[in-house]
Amino acid sequence: MAVTPSPARGRLIALDARQMRIAIGGSPAPLEQLEPWEDFERSQGRPLFGRYAYEVDSKTVAVIALYRYSMARWPFLWAKHGPVWLGEQSPTREAELRKLLVREVRRRDKRVVFIRMHARFCARDTLPLMSSITYDRTYVIDLRPGTPEAIRAAMPKDGRRGVRRAERVAREAGCTIAEETGLSREEFESVYQVLIATAERDGFRPHPSQVYWDMLTTLGPQHARLFVLRRDGVPHCWDLVTVAGKDAATYYGASSNASRSFRGAEALDWAVACTLAKEGIRSLDLMGAESTRVPELYGVGRYKRRFAQHPTEVDGAWDVPTRPVVYQALGRARRTRHLVRKWLGR
């Protein structure tokens, strides 16, 4: 077992999958930091860099799994929704963990330009993401009440009215909602077309369909499930839901333009929540809402807030440079490229 000592109290210890699983024990942990996620990352050509425990006074305070990514051919590491904190999460401990990780990465692979990881506290070494978007606030539907009536009663007033109306309007429009996790590759391609329409409407670029298919197949039905709303047999909305223990998240979703007329997305999200609650799942994370750091999510946040009385604060992602000079140069190159594309109207 490799050990990286520190002049401070903490130390970084390399773990294998079993050791990390034992360290987490029964504590809630995001799927991206658990062992099953490794198969999905590998399917995308992103191998595991390593798993580590951060120990303070011989007690495991946090664990983290990092995967190899690249940007413009420059390698970086990403610990999605990591580290998982098992003890007190203080600014000092966060900073020491980052320091230990930077030292370890430089020792193992000097090519790595930065580490992308999550932190509660902003610091000098935590920089805004060079690419992608993060969030530090979300809405989580509490499914512990168990029944649709009890779950709905815990929602805001406009949310209670909204899901009732969505159920009724979708039903009157002849919509059906079902889990289709075991669908064929050909069947999934027709479902994927809904995401193409969503991307064109909302102005983003979706992953190729193979990425979503790989997520379903590598994670398996225990950890990745697909729910689809159809009208006259045609898919109009879908949610790809991930499950880790007793917690679930709507990882990806899509809705057709036509579905707005019969409130398809809202009807589907509500049906998924009720289905998961019946199975004993305790929460459904809608994954992302606006905050002062991420105002871009205001629109989706307005929709999601109807499902929960209050937002839930989560740790946002940050870039932690391991090669600061190269990181700065990479950032300048990206900004220049974006300016050129804007000037060319592309």
What positions do the PLM features span?
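Active-site/acyl-donor-binding loops of N-acyltransferases
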Residues: 2-17, 40, 49-50, 120, ...
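A conserved beta-strand-loop-helix scaffold within acyl/acetyltransferase catalytic domains
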Residues: 8-57, 61-73, 119-138, 146-261
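Conserved strand-to-helix beginnings and helix N-cap segments that scaffold or border functional pockets
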Residues: 69, 91-95, 297
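N-terminal cap/recognition module
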Residues: 72-80
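Residues at the N-termini of beta-strands
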Residues: 76, 111-114, 247, 283
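A short, internal acetyl-CoA/4′-phosphopantetheine-binding micro-motif in the GNAT/acyltransferase core
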Residues: 80-91, 145-146, 253-262, 290-292
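A gly/proline- and charged-residue-enriched helix-loop-helix capping module
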Residues: 83-124
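Aromatic (often tryptophan-rich) hydrophobic motifs at membrane interfaces
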Residues: 99-104, 213-328
